[in-house]
Amino acid sequence: MRKTFCLLFIFSVFFAENLRAKINIGILKGMDSIPFAFLYSDAQENQKKLENPEVSELSYVSEEVKDSSEDQSVQPEEKYSFSFFETPLELFSKMKAGYIDASIISSESAEKLVKKSNGQVCVCASVTSIDFKIVTRRKGNISFSDLIGNKVYVAGEGLAHSVFRALLAKNSVPVEEGSAGVEIVVKKSQAELVTEFLSKNADYVLVSEPALSDIFNRSKNARVAIDIQEQYETVFGYGKKLPRSVLVVRRDLAEGSPKEFKNFLADVEFSVQRASRKPRGAAGIAAKNDFGVNKRISAQAIAGTKFNFYTMPLD
């Protein structure tokens, strides 16, 4: 009896470490989850084929979305399940509780989640780099020193705000009200920045996609004054890129199921590459599956996104 129990215990431990149920992916609605688009589409399509093997094509998948030339031998539907979330708070709660294994979120949100999870959640890859740009109607070449005496509108006090202040400091431009420095006006969201710019209340706004595309679609006079990523590399060194969005996973997935984790990283990277090459296809998938993006501007916004997938140390 004891021998049988020991064998069963060893058997169960072996399979617990080597066989994992579906990886549960959380999709936080918005631009940051666009890199999951093709992974999600493949999973849904293959699930339909499993349920009805005689169906060779899915009627709901448009020609724009189909990509038979990039068909993979893997079957994502056997490995992944997906849940959608409206807010980071909802996603964080499920990840900490162990119901969600992985997600793509902003680097700012990731920092908060890692701290709140007490190490249960970790960052494992960069997905996109910052695409912040200062937009204006004013013509001519504009440098940081040209911003002195002006107001620059930003959303929140997160990554964009911090990087902007750092670049101003590196260029010896003071942050203060009046004619001697740059005044930073903080708004709650980038949607507010778009409104302020279009209503001509703001001469300079610091925005990223999809707000950037929204402005250019609605204002003929808008132009990029300063590309923050380019300036960041000028100051801190060529090739230095700050992640805008990152892939976060539960540590028990990364360390407890290394084979599945490695395959998952490869599948996500492939999905990111496809979104980069086929922004219209990614936009179509996102619009059909309620990723929380506006189809009117999402294809343009995806095309302007700086996809930059690379893995990172877990600690």
Give residue ranges: language-model regions.
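An extracytoplasmic/periplasmic, membrane-proximal ligand-sensing/linker region
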Residues: 31, 217, 281-315
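Flexible glycine/proline-enriched surface loops and loop-helix/loop-strand junctions
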Residues: 146-149, 246, 306-307
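Sec-dependent N-terminal signal peptides
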Residues: 4-13
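Short, glycine-/small- and polar/acidic-enriched structural segments
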Residues: 22-185, 203-209, 225-226
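A short linear boundary/processing microfeature
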Residues: 42, 170, 174, 218-221, ...
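Boundary at the C-terminal end of the N-terminal hydrophobic targeting segment
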Residues: 16-21
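Pocket-lining segment of extracytoplasmic ligand-binding domains
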Residues: 108, 117, 185, 189-285
